[in-house]
Amino acid sequence: MDHTDRAEAIRGKTVRLTWTEGPTRGATHEHVFHQDGTVEWRDADAAGKGGAAKERPPYAAVEVADGVYAVSYLAASGYTLTVVLNFRDRKVVGFASSAKDWHPVRGRFEVVS
């Protein structure tokens, strides 16, 4: 991939996702979208318990409509998270998938920094 979009609304931000539907329903994850185009995430409920991720895969973030962004990354585990963040109502919808599994996900989000 020669050029990967990383929308300014996402790049350099920490986004807290709270899942209301899907395999991680009830969990909250913080995603740090670094300026260098990588993302790391952790279980926000495990704060101070070493819950930080050890990997930083590249991500893409593209504005698809005013205040609406598609974000995706492929983790070393083989799972891809692809979500749409709607900054107008702070809702998130998307899919967590692997070569064998596919799960729709929904929730809410907040930008924490």
Model-derived features: positions:
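Tryptophan-anchored aromatic micro-motifs
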Residues: M1-R25
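Beta-sheet ligand-binding and adhesion/scaffold domains
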Residues: D5, A70-S113
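Short, hydrophobic/aromatic-rich segments at coil-to-beta transitions
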Residues: A9-R16, D36-E40, A65-S72, V92-V93
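A structural detector for beta-sheet-dominated domains
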Residues: T18-T20, H34, R42, L74, ...
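Generic "edge-of-domain/loop-turn" microfeature
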Residues: G22-T24, T38, A46-G48, D66-V68, ...
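N-terminal glycine/threonine-rich, aromatic-flanked beta-hairpin/loop signature
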Residues: R25-Y59, S98
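Contiguous, well-ordered beta-strand patches that form the walls/edges
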Residues: A47-L85
